[in-house]
Amino acid sequence: IPGESKGYAPSPEWKKATYGPNFEKQRDKAIAAIEAEYAKKLAEAEDEETRNKLEKEKKNKISAAEAEYQYNVRWYVDWQYFDTFNTAIGQGYNSYTPLQLANYVATIVNGGKRMQPYVVDKILDPVTGEVVYQNQPVVRNIVSVSPENLELIKEAMSKVTSGEGTAAALFLDMPEFSGGAKTGTAQIGSKNTELEDLTNGLFVAFAPYDDPQIAVAAVIEYGEHGSDTAGLVAKAVFKQYFGW
C-alpha cells in the first residue's frame, strides 16, 4: 500500500542502530574541521609559544566536540527510562501497522504465541469442491512475558468494555459480547505544529473472553477518540463474525 511501512517496535538496539551513526558522523565532521583549521594556523605560527597556544586551543575544541558527542549519545542514543515509559503507553518511537496491532492482541490473549499471519485459509477445487490447499498455523515465537502478566493485561482489557470502561457503552446493546479492548487516540503531530490537535482513532479488541477466537484492530484517520469511531468498526466485525 502506498505510504505504508512495515512498522517497528523500539528497543535499545534499534535506538542505537538508528541514531548512533548520525552522531558519530557529526563528531567526526566537527573534529575534521578543527584539525583542518589548526593545521593551517600551526603551519603559519611564527614561534613555539604561538604553536603551543594553538595546540592547546585545538585540544580544547576537540575535547568539547567529544563531550558534545557523549552528551548526545547519553540522551539520544542510549536507552533511557523515559523511552521505556513512552513505549509502555504507545508513545515515543512506536510504529505499527493495523495487522501488527491485531497480532499483538492475539498474542496476548492466546497465551503468548506470536503467530504467522496469512491471507488465504484454504483453496478449493472449483469443480469438485475438494480442498487442494489448507494453510496451517505457524508459531513465529513465544514472547518472554509471564502467563500471569498476560492474564493481567487480558483482564484489564475486559474492564475497558464493561463497567465504567472507556468502551463499555459501545457494547451495551450487545449482551453476547464477552472480550476486551483498548481504545486509542493516536497523535499525528507534535506540539506547536499544524498537526498538534489532529488525532487518529484506534481500537483493538478480542472476543470471546474465555476462549478467544478473533482479534481486531481498527484505525480511522482523524477519528479522534477510538471508542467513538474505530470501535464501531470493530463492533461491526464482531457482529458479522459471530452472527449476532
Where is each model-derived feature located?
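A short, terminal or domain-edge coil/loop segment
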Residues: 55-57, 61, 225-232
